[in-house]
């Protein structure tokens, strides 16, 4: 008993000593070190500000910004992480040179077990740029035009067949429903009918298990034998085998005319600059990446859109009236005609709703890079040392009143007078997968910027636009049980989204579109 008491006492003294030394170090660090950004004060070494950051990143960022300014450093699970907020911070980090900053070292431990080896962050950046160029095949203008009827059909089939929407009215967990809809639309549009037909209950379970690999703990312990990691690895192996089987069978049979326009066929015929044909394993891994990338942000944002419309039914009716006015009735029953790509340009308020939701509810709150060489911060005395992690948060500028008055208010009408395009004088650069705008001069960067800017931005707008327009013309949405507003944000995953379950009410419209 006595030894145990002594051990407890020693441990308590050790902890208190560590805390005291940590506080003393921070005080002297501020006095002596003028070449590094200020350190966010914290009591517990190693843990640092991890908890407050993890609970609500934006609340943490804004509180630190008020106290320390746009540039500060905090401890994230023992790692010194320097945050640089604002438009200049976005430019500094997201457009950093390859020799200075590196994304692969930050994200590879998390993404490689999910996406697979030799793709995305598990390969040299030059190879990733080639892979992005291959993938852009499915994101051309003609491809996007062909996606519209496919996406619309998937949404209509879901509204007709899903148990969530049987009868004339009911309730639905809209986060779960939009996750299902967006995996169907992403698979059908980006991957083809052959892959879409394999989205059975088994495939959905595999996707779910694979998605669990993006839990924050996997930044630190990606290969730990935890239950969710075992399921992740099994799901990846099974999903890869599904794609490899498709590829193998196609090589035996030869491509059919109906397949010659899909992504798998495209990748099967791609060759790297060094003359190597893309291996089947890498094709499978790129297809897994494409499916998850095409679904993740669309799932979260589409759920937020529906939740916002349910909380403000008047906005939903504005959208409906826009379709009636600009697309016009067609058949004898007054039903609206099937959507076409050109129709999306006739629905500006639909685009405003999407943009405003992306502004407030971006699914990625932090973008990180690893510093590779001493990095001076222009206009400051600061020098960021190698090994430090840099963190940009474009969502902070999007939520700042200086750029968007009353920024915390969801108001799609603000975009009627708000410039939506990047500044005309913004530089255009080719990182190896086609010319893109650097983009960082804008306070609105829902798809990132620089060499790692999302290449699926146009597809995302098309996908979200068609999903939104289709649901608006078929359903009314509303909050239930007297609830006001929308749910809180769940930051427990790498991709934030609404707290689950997110229950709203729905009611089917009359076949006559005037009712």
Swiss-Prot record:
It is a single-pass membrane protein. It catalyses: a 14alpha-methyl steroid + 3 reduced [NADPH--hemoprotein reductase] + 3 O2 = a Delta(14) steroid + formate + 3 oxidized [NADPH--hemoprotein reductase] + 4 H2O + 4 H(+); a 14alpha-methyl steroid + reduced [NADPH--hemoprotein reductase] + O2 = a 14alpha-hydroxymethyl steroid + oxidized [NADPH--hemoprotein reductase] + H2O + H(+); a 14alpha-hydroxymethyl steroid + reduced [NADPH--hemoprotein reductase] + O2 = a 14alpha-formyl steroid + oxidized [NADPH--hemoprotein reductase] + 2 H2O + H(+); a 14alpha-formyl steroid + reduced [NADPH--hemoprotein reductase] + O2 = a Delta(14) steroid + formate + oxidized [NADPH--hemoprotein reductase] + H2O + 2 H(+). Induction: Expression is decreased upon exposure to voriconazole. Expression is regulated by the GATA transcription factor sreA during hypoxia. Its cofactor is heme. Heme binds at residue 454. The keyword Endoplasmic reticulum applies. It is found in: Endoplasmic reticulum membrane. Glycans are attached at residues 33, 269, 512. GO terms for biological process: ergosterol biosynthetic process; methylation. Its EC number is 1.14.14.154. Pathway: Steroid metabolism; ergosterol biosynthesis. Disruption phenotype: Leads to the accumulation of eburicol. Leads to decreased susceptibility to azoles, especially fluconazole and ketoconazole, as well as to itraconazole in an itraconazole-resistant strain. Sterol 14alpha-demethylase, encoded by cyp51A and cyp51B, that plays a critical role in the third module of ergosterol biosynthesis pathway, being ergosterol the major sterol component in fungal membranes that participates in a variety of functions. The third module or late pathway involves the ergosterol synthesis itself through consecutive reactions that mainly occur in the endoplasmic reticulum (ER) membrane. In filamentous fungi, during the initial step of this module, lanosterol (lanosta-8,24-dien-3beta-ol) can be metabolized to eburicol. As a target of azole drugs, plays a crucial role in azole susceptibility. Mutations of Gly-54 or Met-220 lead to the resistance to azoles, clinical drugs used to inhibit the activity and kill Aspergillus fumigatus cells during infections. Duplication in tandem of a 34 bp sequence in the cyp51A promoter located at positions -288 and -322 from the start codon also leads to azole resistance, when associated with a mutation of Leu-98. Belongs to the cytochrome P450 family. This is Sterol 14-alpha demethylase cyp51A. It comes from Aspergillus fumigatus (strain ATCC MYA-4609 / CBS 101355 / FGSC A1100 / Af293) (Neosartorya fumigata). The lineage of its organism: Eukaryota, Fungi, Dikarya, Ascomycota, Pezizomycotina. The gene is cyp51A.
